[in-house]
């Protein structure tokens, strides 16, 4: 089994804090998610997360006008410059202070950062697509200017259209006008008059007017004019100044303005308020277009795309991200992450969906291809502890602390069955047999295991034997046995389908945390509180092997820990374990920043995956800095809310002594942990439910350069020469797979004529068949050439069917991917056909009617040319009768072709 899994995507969290950005074409949205950046494709409905990560949560992001360079800055001022198309980190830089504002110039030559009350102008590194000479010129950032005239933090920066001037808005109640370079006759100007901090300032399209918005809901229009009442003929240049010509107010009662954005081309002003309402206004007349409530908490950021059609909103307290099309008044994107930490997850049998459950009582179904949440269930009234799919994947089962087990229909998206115990219990674990007819659950209140029938919903049995709370349950994949683990330091194997209930106890040295069945049902893995992993034979009920994973899983030190990271007791156990699809590896995670992958055959650690390096989360650093230790305790644990300048930021809405449940807990150093892991059914990826969100690690090599069987003669140039000049399609395809460049493979693949596909596949080497099969399956899901891809699949199955059957264990993953792609295509075609049945019937009916009309007109033309009113072949029908049969749709001149 391959172990080179790489981080590929982050789900479960769509927005944390900071600003949002639209791409220059307006089709992509960049959102800061913790210490990473997620890109949402709003046209194709897909998302991906850039592979880099910061050491702290991201505070500001900026994008060049060309859309090729992304600058992201964390809370400490550490910046990363990234090439967006290549997804490669280019440069690391430190601004040595927290950055409060960031903006790139429209020309792409400069960018400005706000460092508290200081403003710095920097040169943007040149790239081949931005430099006029087309040369690669890359150097560290070069500072152009520094301005220090504000008296409080700068909150917003806006450029003029010609990139010569820029506006800054600050908490010191003023906005200021600056020039990038020294301009003749220009001096920096202060725009003062607001009673609270200025949220933003913008130029109009003609740059004759400046609009400023303050926190108290005031909108001022500024113009470069003389004093009111002064004679225009007597006005000198010294008399002209930026003055307020109009004042407007939002009138949102006690709500304050948290964010605002302006679109100069359409004169649209949008403002987000602290009560979750946003308003859209047309300037300069301040005509309200509409207002809408989109959140229960304050809106933290709003931005407008280049065309002015879409508005993007971010609300950090609930983790909401929305894109609103104001003209049609509809949502383009509406996503929200879990309010609390995720407890469990499960892959659907086809691998296309991932279900996550959390302490907020919500169940979310995520699409693995798009990365979006497609449905959310909210019927549970307390935290959800476990989730399982039925074998076919149409039914989902969840257990909750509210004392219920619920069954969900994922076709109609409804709860069709609820299972409860005679007494009120808090269920902590659950298992479903492969047939989907039996559900078992254990609780922390009772030491019994409850068994229900899915068809009737009745409680069938209660299994007694454990002397402590049941912590884990698992059915054998073949459906014959049930294994349970408890805090009484035993695991039991139950034969629940026999006439007599028997259980085989397995004695362990510590409390059982989790149990996993191997896919062949011959072995179980048990994780205990002492950090050990034990492997037991199901048939003989004997331990086959064991692993001490305390040193592997331990790592990371919390702010208040007095012991080193290696000696912290809370991180020395695996809370969740899962077998790989082929049963050769075991994936384990716990209350630490590591996920461990073990080999079951050799009992060695194969690889450790670091969940997060975010220092905003406790438990991610190995050593603590003694300089951060004060007399009152570690600085990270001190409450600094009382020192905030804004009143609403000084309010502490959390209960005294509470450690969870506060909406702002994401900013109060939560602890890193992995509550659930799962392998995808095809074994090409695994996911982990962590504090950062739903992390997906995959073997996808579409972005990475991974050559296979390479030599000096194989280059992209030689491959294209073989393809275009020699027309040797087989050789060109093999060379492309050796280089393993996605663009080259696609070019060669699409250049092969469909008539030559059987000949190329017949001579294709067996060593590349699995790679070609996986590539064709991926093309089937993405490419519009449906028949072309199906011809490739048919040829591969026909020509290499014997080899695929003999090596089924090696290509099992590829065959599953192909089956999934073909099944998805079939469903899409069936859906398209079902939706257009009546349209096809109508078109066929129109064709038949047109054919009958043409036949009638032909007969009439023959009669007209012969001059007879009645013909033998017409069945005694006269010309007048034929004309009346046409119901007057055409005149006689049209019949005989005169018109």
UniProtKB/Swiss-Prot annotation:
Pfam families registered for this protein in UniProt: Utp12, WD40
Gene Ontology terms: cellular component: cytoplasm; Pwp2p-containing subcomplex of 90S preribosome; small-subunit processome
Coiled-coil features, chain-numbered ranges: none
WD repeats: 9-52, 53-92, 94-132, 149-188, 193-232, 252-291, 294-334, 337-376, 379-418, 422-464, 465-504, 507-546, 569-608, 669-709
Classification via InterPro entries: G-protein_beta_WD-40_rep, PWP2, SSU_processome_Utp12, WD40/YVTN_repeat-like_dom_sf, WD40_repeat_CS, WD40_repeat_dom_sf, WD40_rpt
Record field: compositional bias (Acidic residues): 889-899
Family: Belongs to the WD repeat PWP2 family.
Protein known as: Periodic tryptophan protein 2 homolog
Naturally occurring in which organism (per UniProt): Neurospora crassa (strain ATCC 24698 / 74-OR23-1A / CBS 708.71 / DSM 1257 / FGSC 987)
